[in-house]
Amino acid sequence: NERKQFKTPISDFGAIKVKLAKMATDTYAGESATYRAAKNIEDRIAMREAAGNTHQEAELKGVEEYAIECSILKVAVSEDVQNCADEGIQIFGGMGFSEETPMESAWRDARIARIYEGTNEINRMLSVGMLVKKAMKGHVDLLGPATAVANELMGIPSFETPDYSELFSEEKAMIAKLKKVFLMVAGSAVQKFGPDLEQHQQLLIAAADILIEIYMAESAILRTEKNVKRTSEKEQSAQIAM
């Protein structure tokens, strides 16, 4: 509220509100996905320890089983942080590019996150590549659902009007459609290129972007649903809006 234009705090302008809302939404989605993956890993470690593995063995296997989710989070969260820092500079205006303001160091610190711990390009390709390898080894059924989606597209579409009266029903329907898109892309790619798929980096990166959007959006919805049941829709109104 310190910066003003036409005697009005810039935080009152719609263009600035959109930027702040996008930052808050991306942060919430990233936080939700991180909590989700961390809980899944924690549960898997406990399950393996109960099965007789040492703690070290359980940790290694537990994290390994959720390596895809970890790659997704590394890409999504590092890019969200970068976008927040970038928009922060935009909000500060010319001052934001100066070392005297906090945004200059925030942007520089955020930028390196897309490079270390495996570049985001590598992590994108890894996320889809690992999923495809699991499918080819029979650990995950990818081709079955992909074939079902292809058959569905060849069939007669439903002309019924969906009921979106239930909370998040429309958002869940959108995620379900995104999953079908991913299955079509990934399934077709596996059928066409097989083991050589890893050579087609552009395709892997494009498929990874779909996978990332699915995981982040679904995580935010799952968290909000849980909190609505724990409290109320009124108390979670901001999170629902996100």
What is each of the regions a protein language model found here?
Residues 1-242:
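Flavin-dependent oxidoreductase catalytic core characteristic
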